[in-house]
């Protein structure tokens, strides 16, 4: 469940509580931004695997910044996405005044307006694997995304809440990839 208790009653998320208190709110992950961990801070859905619905809920959530992967759940099938309802959430977000960054955009934010960054169709690459690509094809690192969020959220005098997840370490662990786990862990020092 995302944003529900075991009896399927909606519950306020941590992100919603921070917004109600007047804080700025951001989410950064190297997984899909619609994946269970980041989604539990803004979404309300009984099925954590229904990432099409979760993506649509991100557009409606009171969020200042969301950076990660998962572009496929924001685009319709005819645009090489996974959305079967035909909605193009990238365009919808832009129509609402949200700045949307995609794969080759440089993550930067001055803290003004709303920013969504979708830097990969699914999860961002493992840190170990990403180093083998030419620089022009590499995903932004978790450290770059974190600095972007911190630079923008810390502007002004309002407090902020930032959920920062290095979720690829979990994926490497599920795959019994010791080198991947170590590489992901070492990147936290950045």
What kind of feature is each model-predicted range?
Residues 61, 155-156:
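Alpha-helix C-cap/termination motif
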Residues 152:
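An active-site-proximal beta-strand-loop segment
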Residues 1-7, 11, 15-145:
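Surface-exposed loop and adjacent secondary-structure segments within mature catalytic domains
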Residues 36-41, 122-134, 149, 157-190:
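Active-site His/acidic residue clusters
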């Amino acid at each position: 469940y995302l944003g529900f208790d075991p009896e399927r009653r909606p519950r306020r998320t941590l992100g919603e509580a921070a917004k109600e208190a007047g804080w700025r709110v951001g989410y950064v992950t190297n997984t899909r931004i619609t994946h269970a961990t980041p989604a539990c801070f803004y979404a309300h859905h009984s099925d954590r695997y229904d990432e099409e619905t979760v993506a649509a809920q991100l557009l409606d959530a009171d969020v200042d910044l969301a950076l990660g992967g998962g572009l496929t759940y924001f685009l319709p099938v005819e645009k090489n996405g996974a959305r079967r309802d035909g909605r193009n959430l990238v365009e919808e977000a832009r129509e609402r005044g949200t700045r949307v960054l995609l794969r080759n955009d440089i993550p930067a934010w001055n803290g003004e307006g709303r920013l969504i960054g979708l830097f990969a169709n699914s999860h961002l690459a493992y840190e170990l694997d990403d180093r083998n690509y030419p620089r022009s094809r590499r995903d932004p690192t978790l450290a770059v995304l974190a600095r972007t969020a911190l630079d923008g959220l810390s502007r002004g005098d309002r407090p902020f809440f930032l959920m920062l997840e290095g979720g690829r370490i979990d994926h490497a662990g599920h795959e019994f990839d010791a080198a991947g786990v170590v590489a992901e862990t070492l990147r936290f020092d950045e």
